[in-house]
Amino acid sequence: MVKKIAVLTSGGDAPGMNAAIRGVVRAGLSEGLEVYGIQDGYYGLYHDRVIKLERRSVSEVINRGGTFLGSARFPEFKNPEVRAKCVETLKKYEIDALVVIGGDGSYMGAKLLTEEHGIACIGLPGTIDNDVAGTDYTIGFQTALETALEAIDRLRDTSTSHQRISIVEIMGRHCGDLTLSAALAGGCEYIIIPEKGFDKESLIRNIEDGFNKGKRHAIIAITELMTDVHQLAREIEERFGHETRAAVLGHTQRGGAPCAFDRILASRMGVYAVELLMQGYGGRCVGIQNEKLVHHDIIDAITNMRRPFKEEIFNTSRKLF
């Protein structure tokens, strides 16, 4: 029977993580459990950075961005000896189960603890990239979307005033969900995402066609890591003679107070994680599909499940632009 649980946040931070921690802590306490927080993710677990959490520990955090527990990337966790020491930390505090909030890398860590040591782990999807399998939305995605959209709206104002071409680089790594949604909502003229690839010459031809038809400005939304956006801006400007500038939104997309959607989603997922543990589940990851909370085998989610591409949204954007 579960008596003590711990929660950690791992990898890149995302708005709403604090709300998820709050959900885990208060749901756990309501079940009579002792709840611990692990500072700085798996790195903190390795270095015994464990603190006890009470109701007041999570007061006034639901509206705060980031994660008050801290987060860190810890590639050393791939080492079996490092994982074994992390398990020793859990045993030291007699912690029975662990809730891990993060992305694919965080899930992989939970998967290894489950497979190798039988630790009851529950994964919650916390990343602005929306690239975790088994869920329609991840914690932080909607807030990051609003941040990106605000930037696009501001760029449109100045691009229109100066007949400028603006390139906006949006986070997402190898997933184009954030770029696609922000571009559709922001009315961007061109969208470049990993799922559809990038043909520079085709982009330049499309821009040329648009200006030949009377366009006076353009906004290009592109997912990070696909190309050097500043070099692309220089090439476009040299080709057309139109002033072209690139804006990299970067880590501003991770910060800021979470929106209502993310606060609610994170709270629901945090409470649901505790419910699953009380029902005897372990080695699961939580998601939301068709507005309902679901859970999947965490190993299956990592190795077999794939996120479907939002083809309908992409096709809609093509018709509008």
UniProtKB/Swiss-Prot annotation:
Cellular compartment(s): Cytoplasm
Binding site residues for ADP: R22, G23, V24, V25, R26, R156, G187, C188, E189, K213, K215, R216, H217
Record carries keyword Transferase: yes
Record bears the keyword Nucleus: no
Domain of life: Bacteria
Positions bound to ATP: G12, R73, F74, G103, D104, G105, S106
Keywords: Allosteric enzyme, ATP-binding, Cytoplasm, Glycolysis, Kinase, Magnesium, Metal-binding, Nucleotide-binding, Transferase
Chemical reaction(s) catalysed: beta-D-fructose 6-phosphate + ATP = beta-D-fructose 1,6-bisphosphate + ADP + H(+)
InterPro entries, per the entry: ATP_PFK, ATP_PFK_prok-type, PFKA_ATP_prok, Phosphofructokinase_CS, Phosphofructokinase_dom, PKF_sf
Top class in the EC scheme: transferase
Activation/inhibition comment: Allosterically activated by ADP and other diphosphonucleosides, and allosterically inhibited by phosphoenolpyruvate.
Cofactor(s) annotated in UniProt: Mg(2+)
Gene3D superfamilies xrefs: 3.40.50.450, Phosphofructokinase domain
Gene Ontology CC annotations of this record: 6-phosphofructokinase complex
Molecular-function annotations in GO: 6-phosphofructokinase activity; AMP binding; ATP binding; fructose-6-phosphate binding; identical protein binding; metal ion binding; monosaccharide binding
CDD domains per the UniProt record, alphabetical: Bacterial_PFK (cd00763)
EC number: 2.7.1.11
Pfam annotation, one family: PFK
Residues at which Mg(2+) binds: D104
Active site per UniProt: D129 (proton acceptor)
Homology family: Belongs to the phosphofructokinase type A (PFKA) family. ATP-dependent PFK group I subfamily. Prokaryotic clade 'B1' sub-subfamily.
Subunit (UniProt): Homotetramer.
Protein name: ATP-dependent 6-phosphofructokinase
Organism: Glaesserella parasuis serovar 5 (strain SH0165)
